Amino acid sequence: MIQVLLVTICLAAFPYQGSSIILESGNVNDYEVIYPRKVTALPKGAVQPKYEDTMQYELKVNGQPVVLHLEKNKGLFSKDYSETHYSPDGRKITTNPSVEDHCYYHGRIENDADSTASISACNGLKGHFKLQGEMYIIEPLELSDSEDHAVFKLENVEKEDEAPKMCGVTQNWESNEPIKKASHLNLNPEHQRYVEIVIVVDHGMFTKYNGDSDKIRQRVHQMVNIMKESYRYMYIDISLAGIEIWSNKDLINVQPAAPNTLKSFGEWRETDLPKRKSHDNAQLLTSIDFNGQTIGIANIGAICDPKPSTRVVQDHSKINLRVALTMTHELSHNLGIHHDTGSCSCSGYSCIMSPVISDEPSKYFSDCSYIQCWNFIMNQKPQCILKKPLRTDTVSTPVSGNELLEARIECDCGSIENPCCYATTCKLRPGSQCAEGMCCDQCRFMKKGTVCRVSLVNKNDDTCTGQSADCPRNVLYG
């Protein structure tokens, strides 16, 4: 019988308040410092996993005790999740690190039906939670040990600049039909759709974070964790298929004109990424300051299209919640959702698809967004999001700690008897093109057009490319 592990964090008797502090999230006015102390209640003889499936924390916020319930976001990563970076001489280096025992959670506050939470427990607690209608940020204090945390309202973070931030999509949605309530859609798990995304980080981002790939990786993971929560009630399941960091140089011309960058990124994605990575949608995360007030742009209704199923987003805030909701906004354009108008409403201060990004962003879609998204899905029938993500790359690449592997690994070197792969060097044997994969047969790529995965919903079976051992997910019938 599987027993749920209960973890309680008790606070020291005297948490204190401060008036101003500089944190990773920015300059903060009015914050509390709390001192978590972990108390674990385990069955006798049980071994504590590094990151439990379910956790519970007791916190004091504004002097009042609250209980935070957390559950690991098990669907955060695709099973063939990969990470790619580039060596100084331009070599592409790809690894498949294990992400099953990750540290990213969703949750709620006890006795608060409207509460939400997205938390990283990798190094202390970092993330946000909604309590009694207010959004709070929690993060470890970097200048002390991991038990010291700051808790503060999002509204208490000083603005990084006064200029309003806008989406670059200018196409407006107009309809003479009255907006129905989202509940009239009768959405249920049978409507579930699945979107596998790849996040590409440009060279400016790599420089902005001082070449720290671990920091970039964790930031992307935290933001996709937030995205996944936002789409939950839309019955759209988001998973991260991979991260690519342009650590050597940009592979496209990243420029302040957002539409031009979007066009270039789409062209690169079409000719490069699908050949080596199964995914439904790709995003460029950039440090560049786009012209005007734009912080993101995307193609409307382009999901599953091999070229325009893309979006570009500026890393415009130190607070990952704000950038994550911009990423959600732009992906929603790909899913056929337009900007909200005055007749649209949600349960937040503002809605995700507002054309102007609020300083207090909402994690809620409007009634209009629900209708537009599912009208698009039902009418346009994008095929790539019908299939629940499956493992398409069975290679388990060894990694050292959290570092990206610095040597090229061509095959799974787990078996000495593998006729395609040298066990000692993880290199393919002479004459071998592959060692494993749905499009690999006797160490050779299967011919182009060979069916590798039969479609259960239409006649668009997935076929081999003749250039890879992977069975690519069909993206040509959106």
From Swiss-Prot:
It is an enzyme of class 3 (hydrolase). Binds 1 zinc ion per subunit. SUPFAM superfamilies: Blood coagulation inhibitor (disintegrin), Metalloproteases ('zincins'), catalytic domain. Its cofactor is Zn(2+). GO terms for cellular component: extracellular region; plasma membrane. The keyword Metal-binding applies. Disulfide bonds join C304-C384, C344-C368, C346-C351, C411-C420, C413-C421, C426-C440, C434-C464, C439-C443, C452-C471. Residues 21-187, 390-408, 474-478 form a propeptide. Residues 1-20 form the signal peptide. One of its GO terms (molecular function) is toxin activity. Zn(2+) binds at H329, H333, H339. The disintegrin belongs to the medium disintegrin subfamily. Keywords: Cell adhesion impairing toxin, Collagen degradation, Disulfide bond, Hemorrhagic toxin, Hemostasis impairing toxin, Hydrolase, Metal-binding, Metalloprotease, Protease, Secreted, Signal, Toxin, Zinc, Zymogen. Belongs to the venom metalloproteinase (M12B) family. P-II subfamily. P-IIa sub-subfamily. Residues 397-478 form the Disintegrin domain. This is Zinc metalloproteinase/disintegrin. The keyword Disulfide bond applies. CDD domains: ZnMc_adamalysin_II_like. It comes from Crotalus durissus collilineatus (Brazilian rattlesnake). The active site is at E330.
